[in-house]
Amino acid sequence: MASDYFDIAIALAGVCQAAKLVQQFAHNGEADLNALETSLYSLLQTEPENIAAVYRGSLANIKLGLETLIEQLNAMDTELARYWLGILALSGKLTKSADAKNALASRMQYLPAQLEHYGLCSDMTFEKMATIYTDIISPLGKKIHVIGSSLYLQQPSMHNRIRACLLAGIRSAILWQQVGGTKWQILFSRRKILKAAKHIYETI
């Protein structure tokens, strides 16, 4: 198997992990903490040494994403598929917009310093990341419609959490493009991606 399918599977797992976190927040008001910290951490990695470094140095940190990717490639959950495929679509729009890419790079450059005095999962962190998503990513294309419990979705703080996770999904989607990922592969090379994802999952 070509090694690039492993990198493609890893990046897609990052996208799927972000999508799963969105679903967890929307339905339960809380999410897998390790997966959440990993996804948010990925946003601060602009020059990683390798692909694992994006996810806190270990692929075990995207276990939730690998599980979700494997499930999705076997039999798609329509709600979840709308999230991760929507993230891929928005990332495609982003790469075609020089203005949006420059704006995103500029905002992300200052994010580590802005968050220096706050925890990775603090309300301020969620708010900063959500604002970047709202200002730059959301206007690029069709909005991702999130469904869940009105008890949680009516809370502004939950909106911030969900948008921060969507921004993390965009980070992994950009990585997916960088390692050679394409939508055609999802249609025609699904088995290769699935095989790679299963192999990675079994080794973590």
Curated annotation (Swiss-Prot):
Keyword Acetylation: no
Protein topology in the membrane: Peripheral membrane protein
Compartments, as annotated in UniProt: Cytoplasm; Cell inner membrane
Entries under InterPro entries matching the protein: HflD (IPR007451), HflD-like_sf (IPR035932)
Gene3D superfamilies according to UniProt: HflD-like
Key words of the record: Cell inner membrane, Cell membrane, Cytoplasm, Membrane
One GO cellular component term noted in the UniProt record for this chain: cytoplasm
Region forming the signal peptide: none
SUPFAM superfamilies per record: YcfC-like (SSF101322)
Family (UniProt): Belongs to the HflD family.
Name of protein: High frequency lysogenization protein HflD homolog
Species this protein is from: Actinobacillus succinogenes (strain ATCC 55618 / DSM 22257 / CCUG 43843 / 130Z)
